A protein has these predicted regions:
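Conserved nucleotide-cofactor-binding alpha/beta core module
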Residues: 2, 6-96, 100-102, 106, ...
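Class I SAM-binding transferase module
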Residues: 82-197, 275-276
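Short, well-ordered strand-loop elements centered on a beta-strand within folded domains, enriched
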Residues: 113, 117-132, 200-205, 222-227, ...
Length: 278
């Protein structure tokens, strides 16, 4: 992430997601304490990181705050090792003209690199590189898994529609390009996957709107697919897989990025477009 930011002497950096303090340590050693601010919502993490940094003689500014809320100061670089959706407007507000923002989009592996534009937004591209980080938090605890019970409910349920899928069952969470594209075009889907000792694969998909899908088959067979709710989630997935086969790749990586001052991300590559908003 720091490499994509093109950090050099003299820049001031906001490190979003202090964590253990490793990133802040690298930055402070390279740039000096007075040019590094690191922010994290978790007071335990910021306290522990500050103590670790003190032991090695480094004292960057460590702030305990919600990084998606109001921020102070001005920075030439903002590098986030947490993921967001959309981009917090406060990041754009504290980014100096021409400054660079590097972050990942929540629940994807896409890295957005964008430079501040005169209108208060930013422009750049989705890198060919990949990374994934936990989503930003807004309180003291990690959010509960609200859809866990749904997986149990649909494991043996008969679908409103039962069909045979076009392609073998895939573990979407491990197919990074596929999962990221699906999250951009149909955000909020959760996945579960299992393969038994005989090679039978089962994949479950659920969405907060009540849509769900279950696909089961041996490793390289076309699966039986049960689907229910307002949308056909497995059909969405199959359309993305078909596009990748027909065109050789998906248009997400390498796409141009335009971020409006309110943090909404607009993607474009060729005739393909997408919007990443709240």
């Amino acid at each position: 992430m720091f490499g994509h930011a093109e950090i050099h002497d003299g820049v001031e950096v906001l490190d979003v997601g202090t964590g253990c303090g490793y990133g802040a340590a690298l930055l402070a050693r390279r740039l000096g304490d007075d040019r590094v601010t690191s922010v994290d919502v978790d007071p335990y993490l910021t306290k522990a990181a500050a103590e670790r940094l003190d032991l090695i003689g480094l004292h960057p500014r460590i702030v305990t705050a919600d990084a998606t809320g109001p921020l102070t100061g001005e920075y030439d670089r903002i590098v986030a090792t947490v993921s967001v959706r959309p981009i917090p407007p406060s990041w754009l507000q504290v980014l100096r003209p021409g400054g660079r923002l590097v972050t990942t989009i929540a629940d994807t592996t896409i890295i957005v690199v964008a430079d501040k534009t005169p209108d208060g937004g930013a422009a750049g591209r989705v890198m060919w590189d990949r990374a994934g980080f936990m989503r930003t938090r807004h309180g003291d605890d990690y959010p509960p898994d609200k859809l866990a019970d749904r997986f149990r409910e649909i494991h043996d349920r008969e679908g409103d529609e039962v069909t045979r899928g076009r392609y073998p069952v895939v573990e979407v969470a491990e197919a990074w390009e596929l999962q990221s594209m699906l999250e951009v075009v149909a955000p909020g889907i959760e996945h579960w996957y299992d393969e038994d000792d005989e090679g039978r694969r089962t994949a479950l998909m659920v969405h907060p709107d009540g849509s769900w899908a279950r696909a089961t088959a041996m490793r390289d067979e076309a699966p039986i697919v049960h689907q229910g709710g307002p949308r056909r989630l497995w059909d969405l997935l199959d359309r993305i897989r078909h596009r990748r086969l027909v065109e050789g790749s998906l248009p997400l990586y390498g796409s141009r990025v335009r971020i409006t001052p309110d943090g909404v991300v607009h993607l474009r590559r060729g005739r393909w477009t997408a919007v990443i908003g709240p």
